[in-house]
Structures are given as C-alpha cells and as structure tokens.
Amino acid sequence: MAGWIQAQQLQGDALRQMQVLYGQHFPIEVRHYLAQWIESQPWDAIDVDNPQDRAQATQLLENLVQELQKKAEHQVGEDGFLLKIKLGHYATQLQNTYDRCPMELVRCIRHILYNEQRLVREANNGSSSAGILVDAMSQKHLQINQTFEELRLVTQDTENELKKLQQTQEYFIIQYQESLRIQAQFAQLAQLNPQECLSRETALQQKQVTLEAWLQREAQTLQQYRVELAEKHQKTLQLLRKQQTIILDDELIQWKRRQQLAGNGGPPEGSLDVLQSWCEKLAEIIWQNRQQIRRAEHLCQQLPIPGPVEEMLAEVNATITDIISALVTSTFIIEKQPPQVLKTQTKFAATVRLLVGGKLNVHMNPPQVKATIISEQQAKSLLKNESTRNECSGEILNNCCVMEYHQATGTLSAHFRNMSLKRIKRADRRGAESVTEEKFTVLFESQFSVGSNELVFQVKTLSLPVVVIVHGSQDHNATATVLWDNAFAEPGRVPFAVPDKVLWPQLCEALNMKFKAEVQSNRGLTKENLVFLAQKLFNSSSSHLEDYSGMSVSWSQFNRENLPGWNYTFWQWFDGVMEVLKKHHKPHWNDGAILGFVNKQQAHDLLINKPDGTFLLRFSDSEIGGITIAWKFDSPDRNLWNLKPFTTRDFSIRSLADRLGDLSYLIYVFPDRPKDEVFSKYYTPVLAPASAAKAVDGYVKPQIKQVVPEFVSASSDSAGGNATYMDQAPSPAVCPQAHYSIYPQNPDPVLDQDGEFDLDETMDVARHVEELLRRPMDSLDPRLSPPAGLFASTRGSLS
C-alpha cells in the first residue's frame, strides 16, 4: 500500500499523468480500495507472452473480483450504499472485460504499477535535487503541454469558424435560390395583362437589384471567411509542424539514443508512455485539422467563388498529409531491439510498436509486420530510396507477425518471439576488416491504412546495427564492434558510419558504462584505473590522466592491432577482465578486495613497505582474464612474490576466496584489511574430519587445496629451519581433462549423411579460421589456444 500512498502525493503534471493511467479498463477506485491487495500480488511473476501462465492470470482475475465483492459487502450507511453499488458494478465490469483475456489484466496492472513507481521516483528525484526549481526536463515537458493546449484552442477556433462559414454559405445558397426564382418570375410576366405586368415587373426589379447587391456583398464576405479560415489553418499547421519536430526529432530521437546507449550498459531508455501520449495528441489534432480542411474544400466545391482559396486549400491539404505521413512513419519504432551480436541458428526476439495506432484506428485492420536482414550497403540504398528489389542478406525464420492492440495500455505492437537467423550472406570485406566488423540490420516493414483506407502508408524501420557470428569464439570481437558503434554513432548518420578515431575521454566513458553493466556493480572505473588503461593502450608511463585528455584512440588501436609487446588487443584484454569479474568475482570487486588495474612494478611499489603477509589482487598482463596474487614476504631470495595467474577455468574448480583461505601466510588485503574479515564469508564450509573421511558408496571423498610448494620451501629457509608454514604440504596436482579442439565438437554435415550442408555457414567458419591462420603464432588470442598449463604437472607456480 506504500506505493499508492506515495502516488497520492503527486502534484501537477505528474498527477495528471497518473490519472491518465486509469479508465474503464481499470477504474481508479479499484486501485484505491484494493491498494494493499494489488501491491502484494505477483504480477511480475507472470509471463504475459507464455500461454502456460494463463491459469495463474485467471486465478488473479478471480481473486480480484472476489476482493472487490467482499469490499462492496462491507460498506454500510448512506455513503456506503452508493459505494457498494459502484464496487459491485466494477467487479462485474472487470469480470466481463478480462474473462476471455486474463493476460491483459496482468499487462494492464503491471503497466499501471510501473508508471506509478516511475512518476513517484521522478517526483522524489526532482524535489531532492532541484528543490522548488523545475528541472530542465520538466520545463521542456511543460512547454510541450502548453503548446498542445494552444493547438487545442486554435483547432477549436477554426472549428467554430468553419461552422460559421457553413451557416453563412447555407443562407447564401437559400438567397441565391431566391434570386433564381425571381428570374423565373420575369419569364412568366408575358402571361399577364400589360398593366399588371408593368406593376409586377417594377416590384420584381427592385427586389432583384436589392438581392443581387446582397449576394455580391455576401459572396465577398464568404470569400473573406474562406481566406481567413485557410490562413488560420496555415498558422495551425506551422505550430503543428514545430510541435511535431520537437517530439519526433528531439524527444523520440533522444529516446532512441538512450536505447542505443542501453545496449552498452547505459541506463534503461525509459517508458514510451509519455512519448505515445504526445504522439496520440498530435495525431488527434492533425486528424481534426485534416477533416476541417476537407470540409472547407467541400464547401468551396459546393459553391465555387473565383479566388485564391482553392490554391490555399490545396496547399494546406498537401501540408497536413505530409505532416500525418511523417508522424505515422516516424512513430513506427522498435521497442525491443534484436540482439546486436546475432548468432546463426539461435532463437531471438524483438518488438515493434506504432505509437499512434490506437488514435488512428490502425488496429481496426491489424497490419502484418515482416522482418528481413539486410547489409550495411542495402540499408544505405534503402534510405536513398534506391530500388533494392526486395534484396536481403540472409534468411530469418518466423519473420512475420500481426500487430496486436492491447486495450488496457493502448499500445499497438508486434512481438516477434521465435525468430532465428538460418543463414547469412556476407559482402566482400575491405582490407583488414574481419567478419566481426561487418554490420547488418534487421529491417521491419509494414503497411498501415488510416481513416477508412483514405491514406495508406508503407512504413519501414531499421534496427540498431547487428554483427552476425557463427561461433561463440567470435563473440568478443563482435561485441567490440557493437560497443564502438553504440558509443560513437552520430545522429542522422549514413548507415552505419562511425568515426575511426575518438578522444580518450570519450572511450573512457564508454568503457566505464560497459564495465559497470557487465560486472553489475556501482563500483566503476576510478581515475587511477583509467590512468592504468591509458598507459596500457598508449604504451606510456605518465601517471596523470590529464596528459591523455587530448589523445585519440583509433579503432585499430582498440581492437585490430595487438598491444605493443603482447599477443592481444586492448579490447580483448579489457573484455577478459570483465568476463572473469562477472563470472566469479562480482562480490570481491564490490567489496573493494580486488585492486585489479595495477602492473607488476606498481604492485611492488605498493607492497614494498607493508608488513609481511600483505597481498593484493591484480589483473594479469600475460594472460587474458587472469588474476594474480602479489604479496610481501622477506626471504633470502626475494621480498615480493607473484603467483602465476588464475583464470576462469581455475576458479571453476576452486573459488578465489577458498584459494586465499588455503594460503595462511596471506594475512592482510592491501592496504591493511585482515584477510578473513574480507573473504571469510565466501569460504566454502570445511567438513569435519570424521564426516570428510566417511566413505560414500565405497569411496572416500577427496579435498582440493591450494598450495605453493616453492614458497613453502623458501619460507622454511627464511624461518631458519623452524618453518611456520610447513602444514601447507604439497598435495597431488589436480589437472582438468585436456581439451585440444578450438571449437566444440559439432556433428559435421559433410560427413553426416543425414545432415544438412550449409555452404554459407561453412564459408563463414572457413573465413574465421583463415583469419586465425593469417596471424603469427605468438599473436593468437589465448582464449583460442590450448588451455594454459595443459601440459604442466602442477599449478600455482611463482613468477
């Protein structure tokens, strides 16, 4: 109920937005009287697109109706009597509305609760950060709403003027008919005697002169009314076009940009509900003005009067048609983007939505949407309106979907749930470009009929660029292409042009955004971390971040050329760091236990003056995704020790916390935190000796323990034969089963008589292998090499 209490505190525009959420589909009184019950139900646990969850949705509907009926029965007194009737009516209404579509009730209530929470959150953020001052966003939204009010008033004014014109014209036509009747009477005068004819003719002439003078004046008045009305429509359309530009070219483009950055881990793009409400208001006002213009044209055709009006009306009619065309085509958008790294033969989903579908009654004749994959060059040709002859660059299964209208939320959308890219056709690559740098896009297209088929629009929209892969080993480099494109794409670009070079601070922002999203942590990259990355990328020794602010990073430096002295690119190393943190060390990173971004020399400088047993965890330079332990311990040979890096494979066998727990001579986490205080909550519980030795099915369960034999002997010598750490006896080496193949073992369709041979996919794999073979042996990505230590007899050696 706390959510509803907060929602009731909303004021101004936020309160109006909340009120719009309710209506006949879900009355606000139901929300009020069943607030606690509604907020305690598992609405989010139901997948509205999964038919198997329908029974649960039906049960929630039945429970809602029962709760309403119980609430109604408990009402007493005079006021209670009216409320009892009203709640009972709502119970019946909801039962009838959602009985055949209980999923729509779930969708409706989720939509309401989500937007209530959003409005409350925005109101709280606004009040805490800006106080009584209205922030820039609210100010802009206020201006948009004020313009809508102005448009409503001028549209009402032209409606009144049109009615006035129609009434004036109808009276004019009546008088014109009277003039024709008088002319007919002149023809009948010959049948009268001369005296009566003369008398009658004089009266008719006076009447005719008076009437013709009136008709001439009224014709001028009518023409003036028509011109004034057309001029008012011109001004209205100017204001409409300006408002539409703000909404479509500013607000909607900003939403799309947020959606693109969300692909890099940025904050969610936010709800489309406010944008849809604006677009629907635009559609409503545009359609009202279009109908007015058509009625004005009809009046002109009914009573032609020479003048400039016909040309003016033709111009405003063409203008309003252009405006509505731009609105319909621009509001056909991709609400849920397909994955930007798209693997063949893998199911994927996407959702497209028409923001004006409800207002323009497009849903009355549900349109079908088709999805195809096209190349970057085909996308360029499409935007130039060049004929592509329905060309595509691959085959997508389940690529057609009918748009559905959801009454509760007022949304018209098509949900592609089970698409799959069967095959891809690649273009010839340029220079050093690899297959993971080639961009495609999913084209969604449909046809919408508006206003009883008065207008028919062919609509198309392109997804964000996608990189197609055929093997998981290509994922890392494909992600680099997507990251660079999402971060540095410019508005209104030619598909899919991106700058080849960007400033280092720009890349820092993109890396930090991606890092926090992948590791799912609020602990991002610090200034010191960014200095370390700059040193690594630019092969520099400067420790001042400002020294790098004017330096540029090229795409080749980022993920095409190996770092100087290493067999990997900058991105491959950074991606390996994110992967190992995401899979194994999120809590340790969030706790600040992993220093990470320091090199061997920096670790030496940090530890040299610390007590024995002080250690730090840093990311390995020599192995992608490796974490090494550096610690201080004085011995005859050395005082700083570095353990051979552990990788994801090692942490799958034994966790970092347990490995640190095994090494009792590691005492303090740098700078001075007791190890057990930091890591003990992550230790695997140790079995009691009796239970550990107990045989299970005739077998005694072994235990794996981390030891460093070389350090044990060194520390024994240092202790003068009275070793403190001799309880860390060497244990038998535990070696994982060797895997020599680069790719998982998949059935070969060439050798399998029942298999389907796919030439495109086979060529794609061949290109990938060709890329590997082109590289010198020392430049191979370690993730594609045989596992480190595969032929070693022990693990945990020192360096």
UniProtKB/Swiss-Prot annotation:
A single MF term (Gene Ontology): DNA binding
Subcellular location: Cytoplasm; Nucleus
Matches recorded under InterPro entries: p53-like_TF_DNA-bd_sf (IPR008967), SH2 (IPR000980), SH2_dom_sf (IPR036860), STAT (IPR001217), STAT5_CCD (IPR046994), STAT5a/5b_DBD (IPR035858), STAT_linker (IPR048988), STAT_N_sf (IPR036535)
Principal localisation: cytoplasm
PTM-bearing positions, type Phosphotyrosine: Y90, Y682, Y699
Gene3D superfamilies: EF-hand, SH2 domain, STAT transcription factor, all-alpha domain, STAT transcription factor, DNA-binding domain, STAT transcription factor, N-terminal domain
GO term, biological process aspect, one: natural killer cell differentiation
UniProt KW keywords: Activator, Cytoplasm, DNA-binding, Lactation, Nucleus, Phosphoprotein, SH2 domain, Transcription, Transcription regulation, Ubl conjugation
UniProt-listed CDD domains: STAT5_CCD, STAT5_DBD
Modified residues (Phosphoserine): S128, S785
SMART domains given in the database record: SH2 (SM00252), STAT_int (SM00964)
One Pfam assignment: STAT_linker
UniProt-listed PROSITE patterns: SH2
Region (Disordered): 778-799
Keyword Calcium annotated: no
Gene Ontology CC annotations of this record: cytoplasm; cytosol; nucleus; RNA polymerase II transcription regulator complex
Post-translational modification: ISGylated.
Function: Carries out a dual function: signal transduction and activation of transcription. Mediates cellular responses to the cytokine KITLG/SCF and other growth factors. May mediate cellular responses to activated FGFR1, FGFR2, FGFR3 and FGFR4. Binds to the GAS element and activates PRL-induced transcription. Regulates the expression of milk proteins during lactation.
Subunit structure: Forms a homodimer or a heterodimer with a related family member. Binds NR3C1. Interacts with NCOA1 and SOCS7. Interacts with ERBB4. Interacts with EBF4. Interacts with CD69.
PANTHER family membership: SIGNAL TRANSDUCER AND ACTIVATOR OF TRANSCRIPTION
Name recorded for this polypeptide: Signal transducer and activator of transcription 5A
Source organism per UniProt: Sus scrofa (Pig)
